[in-house]
Amino acid sequence: MKLKIILSTLNILIYCNLCVSQNNLNKLNFSYPLQVNYPLTGNFGEPRSKHFHTGLDYYTVEEGKAIVAVQEGYVSRILVSPYGYGLALYVDHPSGYTSVYGHLSRFDNSIARWVEEQQYLRKNFSLDTLLPPEKFIVKQGEIIAYSGNSGQSAGPHLHFELRETASENPVNTLTSVYKITDNIPPDIMSVVIYPATKNSLVNQKNEKLLIKTTGTAGKYTVSKNGIVCSGLTGFGIEYTDRINYTTNKYGVWQVKLFIDDSLYYHSRMDKIDFSLQNRKNSHFDYAYLVGEKRDVQRCWLEEGNDLKLYPAVKNRGLFIPDAGKNYHIRIELTDYNSNLSTVNFTIMGTENANSEYITNPRKDQLAIDAECRVEAGADALFSHYEIPIAALGKNDLSAIYRIGNESIALKRKISISLYSEKISGDILHKTFMRCECNKSIRLLPVIREGNYFTAYSQEFGTFSLVADTTPPTIEPVTKFDKPILSTQKQLKIKVSDDLSGIAEYSLYIDDVWVLAGYDAKNGVLSYTFDEHMPAGKEHTLKVSVLDR
């Protein structure tokens, strides 16, 4: 009894601490990051392919919309990259928070001039620099940048975050600062019932069961009756949320699982730890994502799931039903505007002669043969799985191996070593490990140890050694058949590489380095004409591109 009291108190303390954090945000007088209200097209915590979305996306229709500081402070970091957030600003505030503005088209004039000076000084388009407090002081509401489509962006929008400055963790602002008009409860499409061990059964099978729901307007049940379970059992839910006046799909704030009115699982999206982002593929069922493009949230924790999103969890969200007894299952979803959806259904426990629950061992795993070695630490997987390895033949440099199951997510990278006696001389520094996983191909850098070449992978898949001996291609987009300064403002060049990708590039006019932007998603270098290319004379253009 004493233990139960202590656990209950702990849950209450955690919950209250989260509430205090949200209440503090309400009192800090943050303003809207744009001068005009634009529709929210992505919300905090919604699932992306391999991570949680860490901010709010505002669709600005076109580029160039003014972005303002949400509170007084100073620009603490400037980022310019062909990838990720593209052009981004970080502003530290006295309140203890940092605001982040990503996918910008350009910075405000004073910042833009300083950034260009740094780029020319370093002869590099990319920039990631920290700044002292006195460099760029900003007032609340001051224009600091303009919306764009830079980096890994699919259209003109602002990606906005509020982070704790000390921890750098993004926080939820939708339930406090940036509330939206929304009276639509979440949609619940399916529930999933999991046999959580090899000895557990759902409807007499040791495989998870997905059942579609029926219902609407926040009240749902399942389309299948007579569900029987034995052994350790868990649940999951497939859902999406919607917001008034948009057609986008969003994540929800809270998910709760009740078994006979007893709370077994509670998740809440209030803060995201960047260092734990890949745990998203344990929080959500990775196999459903890669196999069926479904976002199914587990309402139970795998052994390796160490996310801090759970105010209350009992027995990792799992339970063992008694034979012959019916259990009422209720799962509740709450969106960021407190709209509630509920699904109710019943399962019955049944006998299982082999239902003894044995905790899965968590050991280092090592597979060795003459041509392949695989090492996975004890915490490489979220749960214990065997790692099957199959030889699939050979290419010019090495054997080809299928390692593991592509539908199983990895918590930590595994080490893969392939043997080859054919790699030396000129191709040594051009050798990579090719990883094919879920129809996607990546080249991983390798470390040579004798005749073994080792790479580290965050995914299972099919692996082999390859050499990238083909140089990148360069193709002008701008036509040079007539004077271009009189008809165009920019020079554009298409660059691409069929294997390892673009690592470095440089543009020279009359043998002088000039600043060219790189749009990685479209593979385009662009140079805006300036004093380095005066009109009325012929110029020599040189483009240098290096792959990885």
Language-model-detected regions and their locations in the chain:
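Proteolytic processing hotspots in large secreted/extracellular or virion-associated proteins
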Residues: A353-R362, E386-F432
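Long, low-complexity serine/threonine/glycine- and acidic-rich segments characteristic of extracellular
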Residues: N109, K139, T181, A196-N199, ...
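Surface-exposed, glycine-biased beta-strand/turn segments
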Residues: S21-T98, S105-S110, F125-E134, K139-Q140, ...
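Short coil/turn motif common to extracellular beta-sandwich-like domains
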Residues: C229-G234, A409-S417, I484-K492
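Bacterial Sec-dependent N-terminal signal peptides
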Residues: M1-L28
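Proline-centered linker/hinge motifs at extracellular inter-domain junctions
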Residues: N183-V191, T469-T473, H539
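Short edge beta-strand/loop segments characteristic of extracellular beta-sandwich folds
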Residues: G236-R242, S417-E421, Q490-D498
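Proteolytic-maturation and junctional protease-sensitive modules
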Residues: E406-F463, E504-S506, V512-L515
